[in-house]
């Protein structure tokens, strides 16, 4: 066990494009999507211990501990590795729930990667991804930590290196349940499947965007506003929308024009997750527990 207190990033992600190519008999959807991380997100402070218990603070409103993805991830790793150890986990929450930028999935992945290191359980990236997939379809991309083209239900990952652009991400004042969008009868589910080279050289789109804009006027309003300034899209099933820029200066200039009551941030895309960089820094003793 690694002693001391450690701090771990739990970064946001964007779906730079998202296409739904079919629906399976079990209700799951076949996708083609491009994930990229952001240098912005939540933060987990974790101290491993010998108690055998997992404590988490602060509690999330309306979410029981047993239903919290951080707790579920810790217990899943504990069971898979048959570890007798415990941990105290503190979450500094920045990312919105129901925003489509991976907040809960990223938290779960950070928990898996951090505790695998702190408990010295020695599970491989493949094993962590397998545990993560049982927690949520997006968790494996966060545990593996590289920008990825995903197919299947999102579990078939291929490393890619899209341009690391600057993004203005806006959070409309609504929370959207992924299930509500994927079960909507008007959702387009038959986009023709294409090879990656074709997808990367044509304008990026999101098949969920049309239905989300029709159901949530606030999303439509914010996206229409962003489109005045730059190419802009929905990420995941929303509610967050984003505009892409070639420089931080350009993104900040548009950010400065937003109303004070609009939640938004500027961040740069990252093809290697900040989580993987932090893990490497701990492993090399570039940074140490305190």
UniProtKB/Swiss-Prot annotation:
Domain of life per record: Bacteria
Regions annotated as coiled coil: none
Residues annotated to bind ATP: 96-106
GO molecular function, one term: ATP binding
Top-rank EC class of the record's enzyme: transferase
Gene for this chain: ispE
InterPro entries named in the record: GHMP_kinase_C_dom, GHMP_kinase_C_sf, GHMP_kinase_N_dom, IspE, Ribosomal_Su5_D2-typ_SF, Ribsml_uS5_D2-typ_fold_subgr
The keyword NADP is assigned to this record: no
EC number assigned by the record: 2.7.1.148
HAMAP family: IspE
Species for this entry: Vibrio cholerae serotype O1 (strain ATCC 39541 / Classical Ogawa 395 / O395)
Active site (catalytic residues): 13, 138
KW Iron (keyword) present: no
Family: Belongs to the GHMP kinase family. IspE subfamily.
Function: Catalyzes the phosphorylation of the position 2 hydroxy group of 4-diphosphocytidyl-2C-methyl-D-erythritol.
Reactions the enzyme catalyzes: 4-CDP-2-C-methyl-D-erythritol + ATP = 4-CDP-2-C-methyl-D-erythritol 2-phosphate + ADP + H(+)
Keywords carried by this UniProt record: ATP-binding, Isoprene biosynthesis, Kinase, Nucleotide-binding, Transferase
Pathway: Isoprenoid biosynthesis; isopentenyl diphosphate biosynthesis via DXP pathway; isopentenyl diphosphate from 1-deoxy-D-xylulose 5-phosphate: step 3/6
Name the record gives this protein: 4-diphosphocytidyl-2-C-methyl-D-erythritol kinase
Entry's Gene Ontology BP terms: isopentenyl diphosphate biosynthetic process, methylerythritol 4-phosphate pathway; terpenoid biosynthetic process
